[in-house]
Amino acid sequence: MGLATFTSCEDESIAYDLEGTWEGRVFDYSEWDGTRYNISYSLLEFYLGAFRLVQGNGHWVDFYDRGPRDYVSYKIHWRVDNQVIYITFNEDGTQYRVTNYHLSDRRFWGTMYEYKNGQPQGYSHDFELRHTSSPNWDNYYSDYDYYWSNYGYGHYWSNEGVFETEDGTATSPAKSYSDTVVKTAPKRHLIEDNK
């Protein structure tokens, strides 16, 4: 007998509304090699996985004021389970759970809690993001590869604004951001109204 899994209609609706790009302030600063750098804003990209109704992958990009880089991008995996949104950073396994939130087609706000190895870290923060773009569904259905390449997966955008591919060729900047390869990622800090 096979195991069947079910997703709630609410979870599917939340995942559908979450898909796209959101901008706003979540983290206050990062520490990199003992130096503190202010984060001016963050950009979060959520994309549903193929044939997955309540989960997917994406990027979380922190933009810096006078930092060692203009921005740092992290790969994330996200899912909705029992109306809780789980965002996990692929690089270090840090997870943020979003609860007590409001999600519309324009705004997303709520409370974010930090977890590491499944254990709460004692940090929480109220945040607010605005919706800035959605996937181009016409391109998604007519040309699957174009959809993914349109968002720059597997590439990075340097500080000089040149978009470099993995084989070293350069093109114009992409519409979206992808991960910069960072040997030591900065430690992220929630804005200082921790509860």
Model-derived features: where do they sit?
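N-terminal glycine/threonine-rich, aromatic-flanked beta-hairpin/loop signature
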Residues: R36-V84, A185-K187, I191-E192
